Amino acid sequence: MSAQPSSSSMERGASTSPLRPISFGDPVVNIERRDDGTIYLRPKQPLGDYPVRITDRLHHWATTTPDRVFMAEREGGRGWRKISYAELLAASRHIASGLIARGLSAERPVVILSGNSIDHALLAFGAHYAGIPFCPVSPAYSLVSKDYGKLSYLMKLLTPGLVFAEDADKFADALAANVSLGTEIAASYGHVPGRDVTSLADLMATPIRGDLDEVHGKIGPDTIAKFLLTSGSTGNPKAVINTQRMICANQVMLRETLAFLKDEPPVIVDWLPWNHTFGGNHNIGLTLYNGGSMYLDAGKPVPGGIEETVRNLQEISPTVYFNVPKGYESLLPYLRDDQGLRAKFFDRLHAMFFSGAALSPFVWNSLDELAVKEKGYRVPMLTGLGATETAPFFMSVNPRTSRSGHVGLPVSGNDAKLVPNNGKMEVRCKGPNVMPGYWRQPDITAKSFDEEGFYKLGDALKPVDPDDFNAGFDFDGRIGEDFKLGSGTWVSVGPLRARFVAACAPLVRDVVIAGINRDEVSALVVLDLDGCRLINPTLPADDLVVATRDRLVREAFRERLTRFLGAATGSSTRITRAILMDTPLSIDKGEVTDKGSINQRAVLEHRSLLIEELYAANPSDRVISVG
């Protein structure tokens, strides 16, 4: 999974209101050009020293601010259950002692099936302290998947020695079907019929080993800290090796770039899943490294889920806020309508950060307007470029030039290499935050690095100013998604996709671009049901079939598609036919991740009949045609 924003031709709306000043380490690079067209970007500022192991920072804060809240979660739907830095350290040492006694290792790691929680964090940091890798898995693999295909695959790939799910009752079917009889199951509570289940409380009650400090001291920069799963074009998970060096170096990169983190410990209200690098490395690591406090948000940017996020933000004022574009879009109407929420949200907010897709100009400008209304200034909106394989922080914008589609420059410690590739500039990365490889997949690992040891992200960039690369770079799509029309003309999918979504707002959440070896480009459209209800308020909240057939929705989409066609500059940007898809994208088939990222290739493969329908000589009524 890449954590980059998609490109967008639509600029952020101009504003005369001031930008809140924040401490920020603007990246500046030295540039080297080779005769073959390859360009190297090397940050002028060297990376500062970083610790050997992430638990060194846990020791630091447990000593200097032992009673500060590290993490809090809702308890019984009302108050907050909190754990301090001192309590986290103590629990980690007990759990580590229990894990070491079990002989767990990289060959027999800990696998965590359930989502974000304090208990999840306790087990994860216990594994960190023991030097035993752990792997957080998307709960959807256990609770949404119908055939457990991905879960079964990764169990064979990882061969865990202990599998944890906070609620054993909830995960019982998945545990029974996928965890071998010789593998230990652990849980905070609940049962699995026919299986013994170790309680987390028992793990936490393990006496601290006499040699624990010695074992902990042997953890080095190359010790595997965790595995994070990412899916390729096949949809089968790859386990990205995350070493202590990667995680620790990346946190120093973050702290030196987002320098306002040094001004005061961050307070974060966060829902982003820990099985992804954005939530699990970037955010939880940023909290720990800088002595901050993370309030776990059980909400999500979906109908029936955003209300919990709103409730949490009505109580807790974040100093920095992280989300995906859909999260900001879902939050926007509540911020607009509730002055109390707006005041609480912007009260001490230094910056916002988005990743995963393009943030629409409408949403961005609206957030600016609300901040100005409340505080008299705009709050910086930040983004960048990264991937699971880069831990993830690799490139960053600066607050003054930030806009959707802009990814800035490589941060200290990272060298970027730009390689000509079919008329684009493919970006590659080298630094201490880059993975050593994929676990037990040497062939895929070898193909992921070039002859100089640069990791191939698969992304393309283009300079904002070809004469001044220090002006930064814009995202220019995924190299593997681009294709040729029958005429031989290249279609740049990433930028086209972002422009299409922006032009069809608020109706469209995402789009799959089709047209390989065809005469023209067409689209399979993923509707945004919230946006559709803005067009027709009578629509049900969760009926995709009704929405795709609704007359008002189809007319509104046709109008937007017609305008989009009118702005086309050639065959590679002309979309004349589209189908509004009436079945959800499938996690089992690898069409979409649990965070909502679409695998274009998988959708095109599994929905080939829809593609044929788009290009039929006599298209069906489902096809919306213009031009």
Where would I find each of the regions flagged by the language model?
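Conserved ATP-dependent adenylate/AMP-binding module captured primarily in the ANL superfamily
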Residues: Y141-A177, R209, N250-V269, V302-T319
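Conserved ATP-binding/catalytic segment of the ANL
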Residues: M425-L485, V623
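Conserved pre-ATP/AMP-binding loop-to-beta segment of ANL
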Residues: P66-V69, A186-S188, V192-L229, N236, ...
